[in-house]
UniProtKB/Swiss-Prot annotation:
Protein name: Zinc finger protein 516
Compositionally biased intervals (Acidic residues): 588-598
PROSITE patterns named among the record's database cross-references: ZINC_FINGER_C2H2_1, ZINC_FINGER_C2H2_2
Biased composition (Basic and acidic residues): 1-13, 460-469, 542-552, 626-641, 656-667, 706-720
Region annotation (Disordered) ranges: 1-26, 460-512, 533-667, 679-730, 838-1007, 1126-1163
Localisation per UniProt entry: Nucleus
Length: 1163
C-alpha cells in the first residue's frame, strides 16, 4: 500500500504522465520550437507536440471507468466523467446509467453499495476479514472483476458502513458515524446521512469529504492515469495491466499498439507516403482532405467572378494578346525534370528518366576510383586507331555524349515554349516591371525549382531582401571563390579577373547585383551605398591610370569586369548614369553580352575579355594597338565621365546625343552586332587601322575602310586568347561574324565550312550573304523590291491584334513573361495598328524621334553611285548623330552629293518643325507617337481643284518598319528622290557596276511615290517659303544649325546586313522581329487593312482604300496599273503633270530636266 501511495505521489510531483511515458523521446531535446512532421504545426513544448501527435496516430490512452469511452487528452476525460457524475446525482440512489452496460460490475461498485441488506452482506463480510476501511475499498476493487485501473466515484455513508460491520445485529439500532445519532431502520440512517452530512468517500484511498467537488478534484488529480503501452507503472494500479503489451508492434521502431488502426496510422510516419497528389501542380498530401482543400487554390476565384471589372484593373496578356478568363480548372499534361528540363506526360515516365541521372551520378563517383586502372593495351589502341575509333571511356567523358544531359531547347529557363509549359500558362514575369536594361539583376534568385510542386516558381521579393541582408561572410560562392585574399593565377595582374564566373551564377545564390560590389565582393544593404562605395574603386583606377599603369593592363590582354567602371544594376536610374561613365547604350550592350561571357567594351573604347575560372591563360597580345588606343582615348574617357551625369532612361538612350567617348565603341559594335544574342564569343580587339573619330559633327573628309562583304568581315579579327580549343569533331558550326574560321590554325576547317555554306547573291547588285532573310531585307530596303506576292516564310500570316490590346491601361498590365534566359527581352509589344496610310497634318510635330524610316532616306540621282560604293567603293564611317542614332560621315568622293542634296532639303526640314506635314503613319520606332482617332481621315482633304485626283489615295508607308527614324519628313525625301542633280554624270550612264531599277518592281510602287509627292504638294501649296527655296549649294548656315543631320546618311549608307544591324543593341533584336509584325514590310499591310475593314467592304491591297461595291474596287484597281513613260536612259526620273505637282516644278526649276505627261484618268 505504501509503495503504491508513493508511486502516485511521484507521478504528481514529477513530469506529466505523457512526458514520463515518453521520456526517452524528449531527452536532450532543448529546442524552443517543436514542429509536427505531418501537418507542420509548431508547439513550444514537447508535451504539447506529444498530445498533438495523438490526433494523427489515433492513440487514446485515457479510458472512462464507467463506459468504453476513450480520450486522447486528460481534459477530455474529465469532461466525460463529470457527465457521469451529473447523471448519478439526478438518479439519486439508483444505479448509474453508465453502469448498466458493464456486466462485470457488482453492487459494491455503485454509489449505493449498502442500499439493501442482501447487497451489503457480501461487502461487509469482506470488510470484516481483517481490513480497515481504506484497505477494504481496495479489496473490493481487487476482488471485483472490474479493471483495476478504473476510476469510480464512491458516495457511501459512514453510518451505513459502520452498522453493516455487525453481521448479527441487523435488527438492532444503527448509529450515524458523524453525529452519533441512532436510527431503528437503515433506510432512515441513509436518509439522515444524505440530508445532513452528505459524505463522499474515495474508493481508492481513505480520502472522504462532505463536498463532491473536492472528491472529484481529488480523483482527477491523483487517480486518473494514462494507459499507454510504454508506461507500465502509470497504467497498472495494483500490478494487473489492462492490456497485454505488444499486440501489434511496429516493425521499424518497435512501438506496440493495442489496435491495428493505431499501427496503420503510425506507419505513415515512417514511410512518408503521400498517396494523394494534385494533378495540376504536382503537390502531394498524406490525407485526402488536405488535397481537397488544396484544390480550392486552383479553382476559379469566387470573389472576382461576379465583381465588375474596372478599366484600371490589368488584363492578363500573353505576348500582348488579351487572355479571356477561363473558369474551368487547369490540367497539366507535363511533368518537368528538375535536372535537365525534359517534359514527361506522367510521373512514372519522369521517375524512369530520373534513373538515368542517378546512373550518371553513380558513374561519376566511380570514375575517380577507376582512374588508377590501366588503359587499353598498345595493341588495342593501335587497332582502334586503324578503325578511326576511340575507347568508350573517352567518349563518356565528352559532354556531348553524356546520358541525361540538359536539353537547351527543353530547358524552361532558356526555352520560350518550355517556359510557358513549366509555368502552366500562368500570367507571371520573372521580375516585376523590369527596368530597361536592368533585367539581369532582377533575375538573380527570381526563378527557382520547387521540388514539391515540380515546377519553376518565382521567388518573392521579400525572400530576396532577406537573403540580401545576410552577412557578407556568407556571401555567394562566386564571390567567396574570387575574393581579394585568394591567390592570383598565373598570367593575370588582377587577382579577381581570372576566377570570376559569368553572371548567371548569381541566379542560384539569391543575391542581386544591386547590393554587391563587383570589385571587392562587399555586400551592401542598399543600392545607393554600393554606388557610393564604387567611387572608391573609380578613384583608385584613375590613380593607376595616372601612374602609367594603362600599358601594363593593356599588355595583360584586356580589362576584366573588376577593372571596369562600377557598372550599376539599373542604367535607367539617375545614380547609375552619374556613377558610371559607360551607362549609355554601349554599356547596356556590354551588360547583355557579358551575360554569357561576351566581352564588355570599356568606356574609352578599350575592349574587355571576360576571363572564366576554368579558362585561365597567360597569353599576351603581341600587337601594340591596345596601348596606343588607350593612350589616345584617355582624355576622351575623362570627358565622358564628366558628361555622363544625364539620366540614362529609355528616351535618353534613344533620343539624346552620344558622348564623344563612345564613338569608338559604336564603330566596334558595327562588327559585333551580327553575333547571336546568347552566343559566347571570344574577344577581338579593335583593328588598329589608325582610324580617328573627330569630335566635330561636320562632314569632313575621312579615309574609311574599304568596303567589305559579309564574308570579308572575318579578315578583321585577331586570334583571342583565353579559350580552350575544342576537338575538331566537337567544334560547333560558328555562323557569327566574329568567328575564328579564318584563323591560320583553322584554315582547313574554315575552308570546308565556308565551302559548305550556301551563298545567296543579290540579283540586282553584287551583294552576297549567307542568310536568305538578310538577302530579303537587302532587296526590300535597298532595291525597293515589292514583296506583296512573296512573303518570307518566317513572317506570321496575320499580325492583326485585338483592339482591346491597344488600350492605354494595358501598358502596365500583367503578362506572361519570357523565359529567364531572355531576361525580359522577348518580342516587345507590337506597335499600335495603323488605320490608314497617312496622318492628318496635326500629327507630325509631336513626334520627337520622327516618323520617316531608314528606307525613305534621301536618295537623289546618286542612287546607283551608292550601289557602286556598296560593292567596291569606300564606305561611310559610322559616328553618333545629334538625334541619338548612329549616322554616317561621308567620304571624300561623296561630299559633293551631300552638299548638293542638303540645300533643297534644309528649308523643308525647317518647316516640318513649325508646320504640320503629312508623313507616313506610325511605322518607325517612335514609341511616343500613337495614332489618334482622327488619322482615318484622308490626307490632303482641303478643297483645292488640283488635289482632287490625289484625295482618292492614301499615302503608303514607304519604308521598312525595323529601321531607325530620321528627323526629316518623307515628302522632302521623296522630292529629293524624284529630282535630278546637276553634279555628277547621269545615274544609268558611266556607273558600270550598278544595274538600273529591278524589272520586278511593279509600276504601282512608282504610282504610290507619285501620289505621295502630289499629296505633299497639295498640302503645302500656300506656303510661299517653299516656293522661294534657296539654291542647291547656297543653303544658309542657319538652316543647317536647326537640324544638324548629315544628309549624306540617306544616299551614302550601305544597306546590307552590317548597316541594318548597326542600330541595334546586340541582344535587343526583338525590335527587328517587331518590324516583321503588324508594322513590318513583309505583310505589306495587306492583312492588317483587310481585317480592319468593316463587313461588306472591299479593300484595295495597294493603298488600303475601301469600297462598298466590287465594281468600284475593280475600277479603282485600274488606276494602280498606270504606266509611266521615261526618256530612255534617265529611267529613275518619274514625270508628273504640272497640275498635280506645280510646286515641284518651281522648287526644282534649277535642275531643269523635269518633264510632265498628262495622267490618263480613265485607265
Amino acid at each position: 500500500m505504501d509503495r503504491n501511495r508513493e508511486a502516485e505521489m511521484e507521478l504528481r510531483r514529477g513530469p506529466s504522465p505523457t512526458r514520463a511515458g515518453r521520456g526517452h523521446e524528449v531527452d536532450g531535446d532543448k529546442a524552443t520550437c517543436h514542429t509536427c512532421c505531418i501537418c507542420g504545426k509548431s508547439f513550444p513544448f514537447q508535451s504539447s507536440l506529444s498530445q498533438h501527435m495523438r490526433k494523427h496516430t489515433g492513440e487514446k490512452p485515457y479510458k472512462c471507468p464507467y463506459c468504453d469511452h476513450r480520450a486522447s487528452q486528460k481534459g477530455n476525460l474529465k469532461i466525460h466523467i463529470r457527465s457521469h457524475r451529473t447523471g448519478t446525482l439526478i438518479q439519486g440512489h439508483e444505479p448509474e446509467a453508465g453502469e448498466a452496460p458493464l456486466g462485470e460490475m457488482r453492487a459494491s461498485e455503485g454509489l449505493d453499495a449498502c442500499a439493501s441488506p442482501t447487497k451489503s452482506a457480501s461487502a461487509c463480510n469482506r470488510l470484516l476479514n481483517g481490513a480497515s476501511q481504506a484497505d477494504g475499498a481496495r479489496v473490493l476493487n481487487g476482488a471485483s472483476q472490474a479493471d483495476s485501473g478504473r476510476v469510480l466515484l464512491r458516495s457511501s455513508k459512514k453510518g451505513a458502513e459502520g452498522s453493516a460491520c455487525a453481521p448479527g445485529e441487523a435488527k438492532a439500532a444503527v448509529q450515524c458515524s458523524f453525529c452519533k445519532s441512532q436510527f431503528e431502520r437503515k433506510k432512515d440512517l441513509e436518509l439522515h446521512v444524505h440530508q445532513a452530512h452528505k459524505p463522499f468517500k474515495c474508493r481508492l484511498c481513505s480520502y472522504a469529504t462532505l463536498r463532491e467537488e473536492s472528491l472529484l478534484s481529488h480523483i482527477e488529480r491523483d487517480h486518473i492515469t494514462a494507459q499507454g503501452p510504454g508506461s507500465g507503472e502509470a497504467c497498472v494500479e495494483n500490478g494487473k495491466p489492462e492490456l497485454s503489451p505488444g499486440e501489434f508492434p511496429c516493425e521499424v521502431c518497435g512501438q506496440a499498439f493495442s489496435q491495428t488502426w493505431f499501427l496503420k496510422a503510425h506507419m505513415k510516419k515512417h514511410r512518408g507516403s503521400f498517396d494523394h497528389g494534385c494533378h495540376i501542380c504536382g503537390r502531394r498530401f498524406k490525407e485526402p482532405w488536405f488535397l481537397k482543400n488544396h484544390m480550392k487554390a486552383h479553382g476559379p476565384k469566387t470573389g472576382s467572378k461576379n465583381r465588375p471589372k474596372s478599366e484600371l484593373d490589368p488584363i492578363a496578356t500573353i505576348n500582348n494578346v488579351v487572355q479571356e478568363e477561363v473558369i474551368v480548372a487547369g490540367l497539366s499534361l507535363y511533368e518537368v525534370c528538375a535536372k535537365c528540363g525534359n517534359l514527361f506526360t506522367n510521373l512514372d515516365s519522369l521517375n524512369a528518366h530520373n534513373a538515368i541521372h542517378r546512373r550518371v551520378e553513380a558513374s561519376r563517383t566511380r570514375a575517380p576510383a577507376e582512374e588508377g586502372a590501366e588503359g587499353p593495351s598498345d595493341t588495342k589502341q593501335f587497332f582502334l586507331q586503324c578503325l578511326n575509333l576511340r575507347p568508350s571511356a573517352a567518349g563518356d567523358s565528352c559532354p556531348g555524349t553524356q546520358a541525361g544531359r540538359r536539353v537547351a531547347e527543353l530547358d524552361p529557363v532558356n526555352s520560350y515554349q518550355a517556359w510557358q509549359l513549366a509555368t502552366r500558362g500562368k500570367v507571371a514575369e520573372p521580375a516585376e516591371y523590369l527596368k530597361y536594361g536592368a533585367w539581369d539583376e532582377a533575375l538573380a534568385g527570381d526563378v527557382a525549382f520547387d521540388k514539391d510542386r515540380r515546377e519553376y516558381v518565382l521567388v518573392s521579393q521579400e525572400k530576396r531582401k532577406r537573403e540580401q541582408d545576410a552577412p557578407a561572410a556568407q556571401g555567394p560562392p562566386r564571390k567567396r571563390a574570387s575574393g581579394p585574399g585568394d591567390p592570383a593565377p598565373a598570367g593575370h595582374l588582377d587577382p579577381r579577373s581570372a576566377a570570376r564566373p559569368n553572371r548567371r551564377a548569381a541566379a542560384t545564390t539569391g543575391q542581386g547585383k544591386s547590393s554587391e560590389c563587383f570589385e571587392c565582393g562587399k555586400i551592401f544593404r542598399t543600392y545607393h551605398q554600393m554606388v557610393l562605395h564604387s567611387r572608391v574603386h573609380r578613384r583608385a583606377r584613375r590613380e593607376r591610370d595616372s601612374d602609367g599603369d594603362r600599358a601594363a593592363r593593356a599588355r595583360c590582354g584586356s580589362l576584366s569586369e573588376g577593372d571596369s567602371a562600377s557598372q550599376p544594376s539599373s542604367p535607367g536610374s539617375a545614380c547609375a548614369a552619374a556613377d558610371s561613365p559607360g551607362s549609355g547604350l554601349a554599356d547596356e550592350a556590354a551588360e547583355d553580352s557579358g551575360e554569357e561571357g561576351a566581352p564588355e567594351p570599356a568606356p574609352g573604347g578599350q575592349p574587355r575579355r571576360c576571363c572564366f575560372s576554368e579558362e585561365v591563360t597567360s597569353t599576351e597580345l603581341s600587337s601594340g594597338d591596345q596601348s596606343h588606343k588607350m593612350g589616345d582615348n584617355a582624355s576622351e574617357r575623362d570627358t565622358g565621365e564628366s558628361k555622363a551625369g544625364i539620366a540614362a532612361s529609355v528616351s535618353i538612350l534613344e533620343n539624346s546625343s552620344r558622348e564623344t567617348s563612345r564613338r569608338q565603341e559604336q564603330h566596334r559594335f558595327s562588327m559585333d552586332l551580327k553575333m547571336p544574342a546568347f552566343h559566347p564569343k571570344q574577344e577581338v580587339p579593335v583593328p588598329g587601322d589608325g582610324v580617328e573619330f573627330p569630335s566635330s559633327t561636320g562632314a569632313e573628309g575621312q579615309t574609311g575602310h574599304p568596303a567589305e562583304k559579309l564574308s570579308d568581315l572575318h579578315n578583321k579579327e585577331h586570334s583571342g586568347g583565353g579559350k580552350r580549343a575544342l576537338a575538331p569533331d566537337l567544334m560547333p558550326l560558328d555562323l557569327s561574324a566574329r568567328s575564328t574560321r579564318d584563323d591560320p590554325s583553322n584554315k582547313e576547317t574554315a575552308s570546308s565550312l565556308q565551302a559548305a555554306l550556301v551563298v545567296h547573291p543579290c540579283p540586282y547588285c553584287s551583294h552576297k550573304t549567307y542568310y536568305p532573310e538578310v538577302l530579303w531585307m537587302h532587296k526590300r530596303i535597298w532595291h525597293r523590291v515589292s514583296c506583296n506576292s512573296v512573303a518570307p516564310p518566317w513572317i506570321q500570316p496575320n499580325g492583326y491584334k485585338s483592339i482591346r490590346s491597344n488600350l492605354v491601361f494595358l501598358s502596365r498590365s500583367g503578362r506572361t513573361g519570357p523565359p529567364p534566359a531572355l531576361g525580359g527581352k522577348e518580342c516587345q509589344p507590337l506597335l499600335l495598328a495603323r488605320f490608314t496610310r497617312t496622318q492628318v497634318p496635326g500629327g507630325m510635330p509631336g513626334s520627337k524621334s520622327g516618323s520617316s524610316p531608314l528606307g525613305v532616306v534621301t536618295k537623289a540621282a546618286s542612287m546607283p553611285k551608292n550601289k557602286e560604293s556598296h560593292s567596291g567603293g569606300p564606305c561611310a564611317l559610322w559616328a553618333p548623330g545629334p538625334d541619338g542614332y548612329r549616322q554616317t560621315k561621308p567620304c571624300h568622293g561623296q561630299e559633293p552629293h551631300g552638299a548638293a542634296t542638303q540645300g533643297p532639303l534644309a528649308k523643308p526640314r525647317q518647316e516640318a518643325s513649325s508646320k504640320p506635314v503629312p508623313a507616313p503613319g506610325g511605322g518607325g520606332f517612335s514609341r511616343s507617337a500613337t495614332p489618334t482617332p482622327t488619322v482615318i481621315a484622308r490626307a490632303g482633304a482641303q478643297p483645292s481643284a488640283n488635289s482632287k485626283p490625289v484625295e482618292k489615295f492614301g499615302v503608303p508607308p514607304a519604308g521598312a518598319g525595323f529601321a531607325p527614324t530620321n528627323k526629316h519628313s518623307a515628302p522632302d525625301s521623296l522630292k529629293a528622290k524624284f529630282s535630278a542633280q546637276p553634279q555628277g554624270p547621269p545615274p544609268a550612264k558611266g556607273e558600270g557596276g550598278a544595274p538600273p531599277l529591278p524589272p520586278r518592281e511593279p509600276p504601282s510602287k512608282a504610282a504610290q511615290e507619285l501620289r505621295t509627292l502630289a499629296t505633299c504638294a497639295a498640302g503645302s501649296r500656300g506656303d510661299a517659303a517653299l516656293q522661294a527655296q534657296p539654291g542647291v549649294a547656297g543653303a544658309p548656315p542657319v538652316l543647317h544649325s536647326i537640324k544638324q543631320e548629315p544628309v549624306a546618311e540617306g544616299h551614302e549608307k550601305r544597306l546590307d546586313i552590317l548597316n541594318i544591324f548597326k542600330t541595334y543593341i546586340p541582344k535587343d533584336f526583338a525590335t527587328l522581329y517587331q518590324g516583321w509584325g503588324v508594322s513590318g514590310p513583309g505583310l505589306e499591310h495587306r492583312g492588317t487593312l483587310r481585317t480592319q475593314a468593316r463587313p461588306g467592304e472591299f479593300v484595295c491591297i495597294e493603298c488600303g482604300k475601301s469600297f462598298h461595291q466590287p465594281g468600284h474596287l475593280r475600277a479603282h484597281m485600274r488606276a494602280h496599273s498606270v504606266v509611266f513613260e521615261s526618256d530612255g536612259p534617265r529611267g529613275s526620273e518619274v514625270h508628273t503633270t504640272s497640275a498635280d505637282a506645280p510646286k515641284q516644278g518651281r522648287d526644282h526649276s534649277n535642275t531643269g530636266t523635269v518633264q510632265t505627261v498628262p495622267l490618263r484618268k480613265g485607265t
